[in-house]
Amino acid sequence: MSLPANTPFSLEEITAEGLKPEEYAEIVQRLGRHPNLAELGMFGVMWSEHCCYKNSRPLLKQFPTQGQRVLVGPGENAGVVDLGEGLRLAFKIESHNHPSAVEPFQGAATGVGGILRDIFTMGARPIALLNSLRFGSLDDPRTRRLFSGVVSGISHYGNCVGVPTVGGEVYFDPAYTGNPLVNVMALGLMETPEIVKSGASGIGNPVLYVGSTTGRDGMGGASFASAELSEASLDDRPAVQVGDPFLEKSLIEACLEAFKTGAVVAAQDMGAAGITCSTSEMAAKGGVGIDLDLDLIPVREKGMVPYEYLLSESQERMLFVAYKGREQELIDIFHRWGLHAVVAGRVIEEPIVRIRFQGGIAAEIPAAALAENTPLYHRQSLTEPPDFLKTAWAWTPAALPPCSTTGLQLESGEKTWNQVLLDLLASPTIASKRWVYRQYDHQVQNNTVLLPGAADAAVVRLRPQLADQACQGVNSGVAATLDCNARYVYLHPYAGAKAAVAEAARNLSCVGAEPLAVTDNLNFASPENPVGYWQLAEACRGLAEACRELNTPVTGGNVSLYNETLDPEGKPQPIYPTPVVGMVGLIPDLNRICGQGWQSTGDLIYLLGVPLSDAGHATVTLGGSEYLATIHQTIAGQPPQVDLALEKQVQAVCRHGIRQGWIHSAHDCAEGGIAIALAEACISGQRGAEIELDCSDISRLDQLLFAEGGARILVSVPLDQQTLWESYLEEQLQGHWQRLGQVTEINSCLWVRSSDNLSLIQVTIEEISTAWGKAIENKLSA
């Protein structure tokens, strides 16, 4: 499309702002004139995918967003759910993918800072952080640098700001080479009587700029996050923000103190698009306008022009609307905390964002044009799966080498099941993430109940602060998890997305928590590619269906598109479609929770859900498995199909068993199947297990041992509860359970044998602990 006549900008200048020619023409039509440079930049960031979700918004409308416990849903800085007893939890997930690819330390660190501001802007004190990280192969030196930098950035910011990082997930796959994913989730406990909203109101009310100074760092970060990565992106370090966690700590305390005064009408974090986003969103949500004078903004650099003020993404900054006459009360609070606070503008009746600079008008745009009436693309999705998936789905286990009770029969010789198990445990995706979480302060605030690596979900004690700074005694807790097997989503976006929701709910159930609500982070490639858009659309359909069925409404989230790297020929290399599901759950009694490790010698071991005899069927399969990828270097097959009705039954049984005190340990069967779940329970509890499997109807033993699928939980139960427990299982699950064996002595071995007493796996606790525990360190030191 050609540009309108007399356009003062070249096509290159317009596209540099992330705008298409037709979008520029729409801007001219709405304004009735050509924009100036500052206004062009404002439209560029606010009409970016990162800010306005122009490709994904139609798909997000299918998500369930209402529920009995939902107090705040999508549209605010964070979702809020009711925990009972007067407690309310704010939670949200955000991505910082592109910045972390260019500057891993600061990119990841400021991702933490940004999500924390979303939480305390609502009036909640941050109590926990989790992260979902994706990298390429650790055999690649650049991946090792990115991995180390990202983990260092997260630990630096979280540790300094005093918020514990309590859980998460880390995956490694060549699909993320050059385009890592850094998704950070934060939880906060509401401290204010009223939830702080972001819509401005009250004509004449003062608008306060508070926090840090404004500089040139983070220029155009929102537009940068809405484009593909290339070699040239390495020069985009100015688009990466620089954070100060100690200043953010002061900002948290000052904001929470300010909110409690009742003098704050509305508040908004200055995140993506900085002043532009905060002014336009606050004005648009309130149906009013904001008149702001840039000359009043505290700066850290001289000679800045309006374009730079408006697009800067300097960190640790907020915009407040105060009740007229009470602004000094707020300013005094921020000054006492060593922070900037100035009246920089006012609320006006005309619904526009008016920016003043050096006595003139630098920009004047209808607020809704920037924040609400943004472009929307209704793209046509593919009517059938792409050809590469049809080829992948044609794969069957018949293509694998033959196997026997002793192992795989490879051309190079036999690989025993012991060795297969050890190789899988040493896969960085399955292996211990201790190298990661030992860098995090996961016990600051002293409310972390289960340490990272000890259970399938993080558990945090709820201890709200009272007016005198004492802590209220509450025996309830909150559990949180982040989950997504992106290989499943790549092979079947609809089923894979459903599986992510199901696994998140299952992980919460394994610690005894009732799943409440979801925040999601949709990490996908370009929606302008038909396959990319089809993956996004199918995944959203799967997420929506699973959330409805499991009664876990979506309270908000983040969309990160254009996650692909341009190779030297300019051909995009997309990541796996990765819809990360963050889910929170309520634990009524912290005395009734579970970890994943065996607790007592002699306990009976049960598998709840899909029985092992179904291995190789649609719900439990080798398709898309870690075994297939790691041992056979194959990404193919149909991933497990999700039985949501059975999921609900199995999870309810697990939660009830934990609350009754019947279950001593519970662990989700995920990557690596039943064999890996058994090994991980042995490692966590440092106890062995004797397992007997009926192999009579199994065509391949690798399907029995390593097939993956949902609705499967491994639990241990004391021997004296056997009769009561099995009676309950038969009543609730009918045939969807089986007794597998018994927990053995400390530091013994994991012994898996067939029902006719043939040994399949026999490894010591030391062997599996070493393979699992040192894998990542060994890769990093190679």
Curated annotation (Swiss-Prot):
GO molecular function: ATP binding; magnesium ion binding; phosphoribosylformylglycinamidine synthase activity
Catalysed reaction equations from the record: N(2)-formyl-N(1)-(5-phospho-beta-D-ribosyl)glycinamide + L-glutamine + ATP + H2O = 2-formamido-N(1)-(5-O-phospho-beta-D-ribosyl)acetamidine + L-glutamate + ADP + phosphate + H(+)
Top enzyme class: ligase
Binding-site list for Mg(2+) 2: D118, D269
Binding site for Mg(2+) 1: E94, N558
Annotated transmembrane regions: none
Presence of the UniProt keyword ATP-binding in the record: yes
Pathway annotation: Purine metabolism; IMP biosynthesis via de novo pathway; 5-amino-1-(5-phospho-D-ribosyl)imidazole from N(2)-formyl-N(1)-(5-phospho-D-ribosyl)glycinamide: step 1/2
One biological process term in Gene Ontology: 'de novo' IMP biosynthetic process
UniProt xrefs under SUPFAM superfamilies: PurM C-terminal domain-like (SSF56042), PurM N-terminal domain-like (SSF55326)
Gene Ontology, cellular component aspect: cytoplasm
InterPro entries: PRibForGlyAmidine_synth_PurL (IPR010074), PurL_linker (IPR041609), PurM-like_C_dom (IPR010918), PurM-like_C_sf (IPR036676), PurM-like_N (IPR016188), PurM-like_N_sf (IPR036921)
Main location: cytoplasm
Binding, ATP: Y53, K92, D520, G557
Keyword annotations from UniProtKB, A to Z: ATP-binding, Cytoplasm, Ligase, Magnesium, Metal-binding, Nucleotide-binding, Purine biosynthesis
Residues the record marks as active site: H50, H96 (proton acceptor)
EC number of the protein: 6.3.5.3
Binding residue positions for substrate: S95, H96, N97, H98, R117, Q241, E313, S314, Q315, S560
A Pfam family it matches: AIRS
Entry's localization field: Cytoplasm
Quaternary structure, from the entry: Monomer. Part of the FGAM synthase complex composed of 1 PurL, 1 PurQ and 2 PurS subunits.
Function comment: Part of the phosphoribosylformylglycinamidine synthase complex involved in the purines biosynthetic pathway. Catalyzes the ATP-dependent conversion of formylglycinamide ribonucleotide (FGAR) and glutamine to yield formylglycinamidine ribonucleotide (FGAM) and glutamate. The FGAM synthase complex is composed of three subunits. PurQ produces an ammonia molecule by converting glutamine to glutamate. PurL transfers the ammonia molecule to FGAR to form FGAM in an ATP-dependent manner.
Name the record gives this protein: Phosphoribosylformylglycinamidine synthase subunit PurL
Source organism of the structure: Cyanothece sp. (strain PCC 7425 / ATCC 29141)
Gene: purL
